[in-house]
Amino acid sequence: MMSLNHLTMAEALAGLRAGEFTATELTEAHLRAVEATRGLNIFITETADIALRQAKAADERYAAGTALPMDGLPIAVKDLFCTEGVLTTAASHILDGFKPPYESSVTANLWRDGAVMLGKVNLDEFAMGSANITSYYGPVISPWSKGRRVQRDAAPAGSGVLSEVAEAFRQPQPVTEWEWERRLVPGGSSGGSAAAVAARVAMAATGTDTGGSIRQPASFVGIVGLKPTYGRCSRWGIVAFASSLDQAGPMTRTVRDAAIMLRSMAGFDPKDSTSADVPVPDYEKAITGDIRGLRVGIPREYRVDGMPAEIDRLWQQGVEWLKAAGAVPVEISLPHTKYALPAYYIVAPAEASSNLARYDGVRFGLRVEGKDLKEMYENTRGEGFGREVRRRILIGTYVLSAGYYDAYYLKAQKVRARIAEDFTKAWEQCDVILTPTAPNTAFGIGEKMDDPIAMYLNDVFTVPANLAGLPGLSVPAGLAANGLPLGLQLVGRPFDEATLIRTAAVLEQAAGPQPLPPVHA
C-alpha cells in the first residue's frame, strides 16, 4: 500500500470514506513526515496536539456518517494567516510572541470543513520575496536540493577524568542531520507551503499571492498553485502586504485537490470589504476533460529577451497538448505587459509602507525600549523588520511622498488600469491565456541575494494577473535539462476559476506523472 502521506487529497478522502484507514492514522503519518524533514526548515510552529485533536473529531464524524468536505485531511498553513491562540509571525522578528485572539476567515472555513492543521509554515518576511530567503527564521530549503541524511552523535564532549569515565559508559545519542551539495530556493513568498506539499509533509497548504507568491513557488517545486480572482477568498485575518493585490489560494499536488480545497477556502465574507458576493461552484465538477473549442490565448509579449529556450519549448509543448485535446490556439496581444513589473514594484511597496506603519511595539509583538516614545518606535522597527522589508517600506514611502506621488504612484495606477484593459480586450478573442509560470527554474540559496532587481524578475510572468485581479494557476509540466521542475501558467476571466481548473487538468494529464523530489518523507 502507498504511504499515507503520499496520497492525494482525493485519494485520502476515498480511503477515509471506505474505512481503509482513520484520520488519526493519516495525521500521524504526516506528523512523522514533519519530523523527518525538519532539515528543510519548513515549519515555524508545529501543532501536533491540535492536529490529533482535529483528527479524532473527524474520525467521530466518519463513524457517525456526518463527514465534512475536507474531513481529516492534514494541511499546512502559511504563517501569514492568523490562527486563534497559535503563534502567528509573518516570518518577522517584529511579531515575536503574537498569538491572535481570532481566526482568519480562510482558515476558519477550512476547519469548518474538517481540515487538520499540522502547523504554521515558513515564508518570506511579510510575504515580501520570491525565494523564501528573507524569513527571520531562516531560509526554506527546496526538497529538490541535493543532499543526504547523516547520523551524528549529539552528546557534547566534556573534559577531565570524570568526563572520560562517563564517556566510556555512555550510550551513543544519534541525531539525523543534513549535508547539502547545493541548497536550492523553493520560490516565494509561499516557499514553506510549496516545500511542505512537494516533500509529502502536508497534503496541501494555504498560500497567498500578491505578485506570484503561490504560482512561482509551485513552478519551482513541481506542484499545483492556484491564485483565485481578487475577492474570491476573504483577506480578513491575513497579515496584509499590499491590500489591493493580496489573495489567498490553495497549493496542492494535483489539480483535483486544488478544486477541492478552493471550494472550502472561498466564499463571501462581510468582514472583508473587498470580498465578492458571488456563488462558489463545485470546482471538482469542472474537471471533465473536455476543452473542445476552447480558445487559448498566446500573448506575444511574453516572449521576453533572455528566456531560456527550453522554457519557450515547454510553452509550445503546452500549446500542442491543448490543441490535441481540441482547443484552439489564438495569438493575442497584451501591449502593456512590459510595464507590469515596474508598476507592481511601485504599487505594492506603497501599500506595504502604509500597512506596516501599524507595527510600533506598543500593543503586540517585539518592543525595544528607548529614552522616549519616538526612540522606542525607531528601535523596535529598526530591529524588528528585516532588510528586504525595510527596503520596500523606504520605496513605498518615497513614491507616496508629496514631491513624487504624481510621478510614480499615480502613474503606476494608470499603467495598472491599462494592463487590466489589455486583458478585457483579450477576452474578446480567447477564453483562457497560456504562458510560462517563471522565466527560470529554482536557483541556489544566496545566488541572487545581492541583486534585488534580478530577484524581482522572477515574477515577470505572474505579476500582470495580480494587477488585473484575475485568477491564475500554475501546473507542473515537466523537468528542465538541469532536472528541476517547470510549470505552465493559465490566466482566466474574473471568477472563472472553473475554466482554469478544467484546462489545467488536461495539461496535467498530458504532462503525465511528475517525479518525486530527491528529499521527501
UniProtKB/Swiss-Prot annotation:
The active site is at K78, S189, S213. It catalyses: L-glutamyl-tRNA(Gln) + L-glutamine + ATP + H2O = L-glutaminyl-tRNA(Gln) + L-glutamate + ADP + phosphate + H(+). Its EC number is 6.3.5.7. GO terms for cellular component: glutamyl-tRNA(Gln) amidotransferase complex. It comes from the Bacteria. GO terms for molecular function: ATP binding; glutaminyl-tRNA synthase (glutamine-hydrolyzing) activity. HAMAP family: GatA. Belongs to the amidase family. GatA subfamily. This is Glutamyl-tRNA(Gln) amidotransferase subunit A. The lineage of its organism: Bacteria, Pseudomonadati, Pseudomonadota, Alphaproteobacteria, Rhodospirillales.
